[in-house]
Amino acid sequence: MAIVKCKPTSPGRRHVVKVVNLELHKGKPFAPLVEKNSKSGGRNNNGRITTRHIGGGHKQAYRIVDFKRNKDGIPATVERLEYDPNRSANIALVLYKDGERRYILAPKGLKAGDQIQSGVDAAIKAGNTLPMRNIPVGSTVHNVEMKPGKGGQIARSAGTYVQIVAREGSYVTLRLRSGEMRKVESDCRATLGEVGNAEHMLRVLGKAGAARWRGVRPTVRGTAMNPVDHPHGGGEGRNFGKHPVSPWGLQTKGKKTRSNKRTDKFIVRRRSK
């Protein structure tokens, strides 16, 4: 893994910082685990924009990643590490002893030739997946389930992890990167170690075009628009004279958006601001 700062041979390369990993596979992905990935342009089934600033970008194929890690008792060998355009983390192609291949999230330190395993009998080492009742308190884990058997949902981005801080009854208490402490059933699975490719946060795209390759469109301020386009638009000068709102007139900046009261009881401590 190397951090490369480009020489300023042009305005577009002046600020570019790349993360180069020579261990990544340079060929095509494993075809049986690849699906077509259609772009939405940020529109829903009515054709209306639901998420702004999305559109265009290079065509990408979706890699089917195994977040459940439910192939118990069968050891697997890591064949290679690969780039995945759909996520910040790298992925690993693993070959199970029975001949099946799957993609998994590549933990920190995993390399080709390593052995991994899932299930209650798996060793306590990075890359192995166990129910959290079988993982020692204080361990660092990633790809954590919120419901048993549903598949990992917490800590899947590059460099992320969760710490198991307590075990009480049928629940374990987790400390998330945000500072939140929450309870999860101890039968939920997690993978030991932290997600690899932590250097992803150090990259600098360097130019607007690099964002467009990724399907990200420009973000235009509401005050720079006309009244027909945004509640902040129009007027003389730059003051819009009201509380900040979204393009649809809903209050923004500080308004609470979480309405899931059903799971509030599992949050021991709110995330730190």
From Swiss-Prot:
Pfam families: Ribosomal_L2, Ribosomal_L2_C. InterPro entries: NA-bd_OB-fold (IPR012340), Rib_uL2_dom2 (IPR014722), Ribosomal_uL2 (IPR002171), Ribosomal_uL2_bac/org-type (IPR005880), Ribosomal_uL2_C (IPR022669), Ribosomal_uL2_CS (IPR022671), Ribosomal_uL2_dom3 (IPR014726), Ribosomal_uL2_RNA-bd_dom (IPR022666). GO terms for molecular function: rRNA binding; structural constituent of ribosome; transferase activity. Keywords: Ribonucleoprotein, Ribosomal protein, RNA-binding, rRNA-binding. It comes from the Bacteria. Residues 32-53, 221-273 are annotated as: Disordered. GO terms for cellular component: large ribosomal subunit. Residues 39-48 have a biased composition (Low complexity). One of its GO terms (biological process) is cytoplasmic translation. Part of the 50S ribosomal subunit. Forms a bridge to the 30S subunit in the 70S ribosome. Belongs to the universal ribosomal protein uL2 family. One of the primary rRNA binding proteins. Required for association of the 30S and 50S subunits to form the 70S ribosome, for tRNA binding and peptide bond formation. It has been suggested to have peptidyltransferase activity; this is somewhat controversial. Makes several contacts with the 16S rRNA in the 70S ribosome. This is Large ribosomal subunit protein uL2. The gene is rplB.
